[in-house]
UniProtKB/Swiss-Prot annotation:
Residues annotated with Phosphoserine modification: 276, 278-279
Record organism: Homo sapiens
Protein name: Small ribosomal subunit protein RACK1
Modified residues (N6-acetyllysine): 130, 183
GO biological process, one term: negative regulation of phosphatidylinositol 3-kinase/protein kinase B signal transduction
Post-translational modification: Phosphorylated on Tyr-228 and/or Tyr-246 by SRC. This is required for binding to SRC.
Length: 317
């Protein structure tokens, strides 16, 4: 008897790539998805056989692709970043923008909330990392020892006893920053291509990075060293740790690989069955991943504008 993933359904509603998905333990029947259609959709999960969820509300306001979205820990607010160069804070009860964050000179590629929701970090194509308060005031711009190329992803560690930010960029580097003084703690060197994503484990002890070279590299955040590398075999667009299993999920081109980190083995590989009329048609790429808070459901966003929903099931292999 092994755990495996079963496709449960899809969420249809976007008219552009699904760039990010956010879940919250406060509201297990709600998820948010960001898209290149310039909107964020708030979904009500019905878990019906035919339709896994219905679009309840579209958050509109960005004038270009929405690149990232996260939900505050109380489930009341969402934070988004866009290629229009701004961040927006949304009140999820009303669906309105409560703050616009202006300061980046180019596309915002990534946004994150600190665990206490008091600080916000953003990464941009202007090669800077900015720290903001929730009132929309930029408190600090990291330029010293910053990335020499686009900053593709920024994340806070959830561990409040080790307050750090992890970033990655198109300069192939993973950087760890001390949140107290915004100074560089560690440069993690090893990737051979540009990086798309970095994610921190739920306990804050390690992080994983991935991008063009198809390698998921794992780094020890306490010791500041490289642990091991998992071969994804294709460009890595997104990475996320399971909230309750020692698993790492990677969006590798059109498929999703799930590794058990204890044995460093693949638990499952998720591919969507594409009935293609021409063999030259490229299958949709997986661009975003998010687990439900209970770790039983995996949401995946794709370049065919769909969110596919997979569930952990017990099966016989």
């Amino acid at each position: 008897m092994t755990e495996q993933m079963t496709l449960r359904g899809t969420l249809k509603g976007h008219n552009g790539w699904v760039t990010q998905i956010a879940t919250t333990p406060q509201f297990p029947d709600m998820i948010l998805s960001a898209s290149r259609d310039k909107t964020i959709i708030m979904w009500k999960l019905t878990r019906d056989e035919t339709n896994y969820g219905i679009p309840q509300r579209a958050l509109r306001g960005h004038s270009h692709f929405v690149s990232d979205v996260v939900i505050s820990s109380d489930g009341q607010f969402a934070l988004s970043g866009s290629w229009d160069g701004t961040l927006r804070l949304w009140d999820l009860t009303t669906g309105t923008t409560t703050r616009r964050f202006v300061g980046h000179t180019k596309d915002v590629l990534s946004v994150a909330f600190s665990s206490d929701n008091r600080q916000i970090v953003s990464g941009s194509r202007d090669k800077t990392i900015k720290l903001w308060n929730t009132l929309g005031v930029c408190k600090y711009t990291v330029q010293d020892e910053s990335h020499s190329e686009w900053v593709s992803c920024v994340r806070f560690s959830p561990n409040s006893s080790n307050p750090i930010i992890v970033s990655c960029g198109w300069d192939k580097l993973v950087k760890v920053w001390n949140l107290a003084n915004c100074k560089l703690k560690t440069n993690h060197i090893g990737h051979t291509g540009y990086l798309n994503t970095v994610t921190v484990s739920p306990d804050g002890s390690l992080c994983a990075s991935g991008g063009k070279d198809g390698q998921a590299m794992l780094w020890d955040l306490n010791e500041g060293k490289h642990l091991y590398t998992l071969d994804g075999g294709d460009i890595i667009n997104a990475l996320c740790f399971s909230p309750n299993r020692y698993w790492l999920c990677a969006a590798t081109g059109p498929s999703i690989k799930i590794w058990d980190l204890e044995g460093k083995i693949i638990v499952d590989e998720l591919k969507q069955e594409v009935i293609s009329t021409s063999s030259k048609a490229e299958p949709p790429q997986c661009t975003s991943l998010a687990w439900s808070a209970d770790g039983q459901t995996l949401f995946a966003g794709y370049t065919d504008n769909l969110v596919r929903v997979w569930q952990v099931t017990i099966g016989t292999r």
